[in-house]
């Protein structure tokens, strides 16, 4: 290419620093980049953006894969990549996303801290239903387009704050996502270890090579249970997250302690799993004879005959071939009973969750526990460091060293920066409901955010994306906010953990 032409092209190229104001507004940090809260300098709009700078020179295969996918994916419940900026002077790459003020990691932490402070404030069941519905809707879109997310967890589920899309769920961190139509080789050969331990399906832990969409469904079941209880259902001690061996004794032990050991009739193909001999050697069925999901959820006041439990049971089915699909889950009776899911998950309530705080450019993101520096490779949206409550909250379950690299809702000790009161529900619940006998369906991003989820708001796309994914190695990615750019994280909930996901 002619040198003069290249120089002219470089001079005309839009530069991030000329277009956006972001200095001093860092909200996330990871080994692969930084995330800033940004606004346009020209004042064309008052919209807030998440501006992610990828560290180093050039761009990784993981980032290439994510960019390629995000440029094709268009859905109200999937984070939108607005633009990519390439700087030829310093060879840096910038990604521009919509900005989400909250995420499920911080929202759940807020409620868990309220329990620790003996002022329990449960997530409203109507909010849980709307959150789950939108997560399923977004995943249904990805699966219909032959995309596996493979790293679903609370930190990667963003929730929009005040604005036109108030309360809208955005699935973020597509750094692990892969197309699954006709892979050249088994996916397990390409990425031996995928998904944060606590949200990893049992077939992955047993070495399944040709895993399917069912791994995302299991992770959604884990998130659903966590929304209902404010505790990670399968939390356990974390070992070396870089291992290429999928078998994880402690994680399987935790799953069996909650669910019980699967009977042969319930999971016939378990004997075909590569790690089944190890399972037989290390575990005894009788150890878990008194364990069941029913007993676990009854402790959290969820009745076994309720529609909420029956759907959870379908999502957390051990046999992946019997696990419910996202499409089937969207049709579940749970979503047909009142209160119906809404486009704005906060419908009828004030938002009590703190906004993200800005990070100091020089201070390390994790000031407390340095073990939290280990994070699984993932991409996340900006999150602000959680504020500390007067008394340090005691986390009921061991907190995950953010394999949730904080997707984050801006921090959240009970009562921190938020209202001391619980969420206040609207007196007229009919305003937020879908007409009777209508199948709820989330509307387009331009829809009235507080309105009911209408069946005809939009149709799911079933067409395949015209994109061939590049193969990533087995390294795990860590994240800077839900705006994904690979980074490593270890899995433990911790009040000070704050990597935002994009």
Swiss-Prot record:
Q: Which residue stretches belong to region Disordered?
A: 359-502
The listed locations are: Cytoplasm; Cytoplasm, Perinuclear region; Nucleus
The annotated regions of Polar residues compositional bias extend over 424-435, 458-467
Per the database record, which ranges form the Protein kinase domain? Answer: 21-335
GO BP annotations listed: cellular response to lipopolysaccharide; positive regulation of apoptotic process
Q: What molecular function does GO assign, one term?
A: cyclin-dependent protein serine/threonine kinase activity
Tell me yes or no: is Kinase among this UniProt entry's keywords.
yes
Q: Which GO terms describe its cellular component?
A: CKM complex; cytosol; nucleoplasm; nucleus; perinuclear region of cytoplasm
Q: Which domain of life is it from?
A: Eukaryota
Identify which residues the record assigns to the active site.
151
**PTM Phosphoserine: at which residues?**
449
Task: Check the record and name the PROSITE patterns matching this protein.
Answer: PROTEIN_KINASE_ATP, PROTEIN_KINASE_DOM, PROTEIN_KINASE_ST
- Where ATP is bound, by residue? 27-35, 52
InterPro entries per UniProt: CDK (IPR050108), Kinase-like_dom_sf (IPR011009), Prot_kinase_dom (IPR000719), Protein_kinase_ATP_BS (IPR017441), Ser/Thr_kinase_AS (IPR008271)
Compositionally biased region (Low complexity): 371-392, 468-496
Q: Where is the composition biased (Gly residues)?
A: 408-421
Reactions this protein catalyses: L-seryl-[protein] + ATP = O-phospho-L-seryl-[protein] + ADP + H(+); L-threonyl-[protein] + ATP = O-phospho-L-threonyl-[protein] + ADP + H(+)
Which family is annotated?
Belongs to the protein kinase superfamily. CMGC Ser/Thr protein kinase family. CDC2/CDKX subfamily.
Name this protein carries in UniProt: Cyclin-dependent kinase 19
Tell me which species this is from. Answer: Homo sapiens
**Gene symbol?**
CDK19
